[in-house]
Amino acid sequence: DINNVYVNAHNHGIDAIRYLDVLPRHAVRQIHLAGHSEDALGSGLLIDTHDAPVCDAVWALYAHAMQRFGGVPTMIERDDNIPPLAELLGELEIARGIAANTRLERAA
């Protein structure tokens, strides 16, 4: 879950890229994408709620994950605040674009 990696890295002050880089390549069979929320008390704490669009930082982390782990299946999760279908399809197109770019870069 790329959003979970991002949220935990933010909350615990660790490097999300480094976290992904130490995972064994063979262990990653599927990637999940989701959004998160910020703590309502304004503490800066992020919460992996799966109820918001995928943010730019998570898309960037996803691109890194695809470079590292190759063409593993990806799913976009929404557990609450389900948006209109057009918005979900927009996120799907972003994920497909990142995956396609990764395939081209790996083939070069």
Feature-to-residue mapping (PLM):
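Active-site beta-loop-alpha junctions enriched in small/polar residues
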Residues: 3-7, 34-38, 77-81
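Gly/Pro-rich active-site loop or hairpin
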Residues: 9-69
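Rossmann-like AdoMet/SAM-dependent catalytic core
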Residues: 58, 69, 73-75, 88-89
